[in-house]
Amino acid sequence: MLAANDYRGGLGVSLFRRCSIGILLLTCLVTGPAYAELMTLKKRQQLDLSQYSVTNPEASYFDVATRKALLASTDNSLLLQSIDNLSGGMSCRQLLEIPPITNRLRIPGFYPDPQAWRQASQPLFQFEDSVSNLAGAFVATDDDYYAQCLGRFLDQWASQDALVHFHYSPSDRQAWYATESMIFAAAMAYSIVRPELEDQPEQRERIEDWFSRLAYRHAYVPNQTKESCCNNHFYRRALYATMIGVLTEDNELFRYGVGAVYSALNEMTQQGGLPRELARGRRAVHYQNYALMYLVTNMQIISRQGYDIFHLKVDGHTIKDAVDFLLDAIEDASILGENIPREQYHGFLRDNQYSSWMEIYQQHFSDPRIAEFLITQRPIYNRSAGGYVTLFFMDPTVQKYRRPKTEDEEKQQLSVYGKESSPL
């Protein structure tokens, strides 16, 4: 069995060294007015995050007890529908029959062959849905059965060292990418039920040791490419690092997650763009949103440890600048600059899992454009980055009923956002 310390040696410095490779190349790809300089190795190494430490290992990414109490007395039809859907019952015995992934995982790339990618990814999606559904059912019903089942399910995977082995090379990274979301899906779901497993100390120890080994094993992959080391995949790794750091009271992991927020704010353009995401051409807006999905969710975990991270200002920038830039760019792609195509891919706006972060964001800021957009998106579920976010976060007073888009709204969205495109 691999020990967590096997992957700790020089974690921060080694990862930041890889992140520095290719900075000049990327800067050339994304040029134009008001673009920030990408964070250098030296600057990353100089980040002092010693003021950040885990203060409450029992804190999930939302106040579970308070939310369960609210749901128990709500008359909100939208929330009641979600509660009813999750109360149908899941068989723990059937879930425990799902075989843990213990082989050296290998997944084909999405863009070369989407069909092969989807087929190979089904067991991974099944895992993410399983942990998120159990956590959601526990919150919806307050039935300890689901918490205990999630503990047994994760313990089974932990006991067999699942997900530790995966194929990776600089030219074949998909298995590494895929396990990112499996790790944070499991850690976030577990954080919801962890207090219910207090009478299972050995089980908790096995699960948390497994999480720690996965985090260090995964984050310390050698020969990371210039694209993967520091862009949205860095933010995805930061998400599980922060959550597992909390669960295991590991300040090194926790600060790794915090460091991703500092990195994003530091690199932000004057207008609020994330240069590494804007380098994606026709998918620049999509990847700005994609990055925010993990940054905002990560920030929510950090905020639950008592830090006002949503108002953190680095070089004059806050996360609100990135959100405002996204919303502006959706409406008018010309703000992206001369070197980025105005014909932007907007298919993500029709898939509500990509708006999961907005439900969290609205708890900290009340953005009218987001509020209007969410009305036709709810209820929102993201199988890995937050689960049933509408059930967990929505203020019951803002929307009482599910409201699909009208025909006129569909036409208006198409006129503003453009026709949905297939992934390039």
Predicted regions and their residues:
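Alpha-solenoid repeat scaffolds
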Residues: 164, 251, 267-271, 309, ...
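Extracellular glycan-targeting catalytic surfaces
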Residues: 36-224, 303, 311-424
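A beta-strand-loop signature enriched in Asp, Gly, Thr, and Trp
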Residues: 269-285, 301-319
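Bacterial N-terminal signal peptides
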Residues: 22-30
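Bacterial N-terminal signal peptides that target proteins for export
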Residues: 5-23
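Active-site cradle of extracellular carbohydrate-active enzymes
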Residues: 176-289
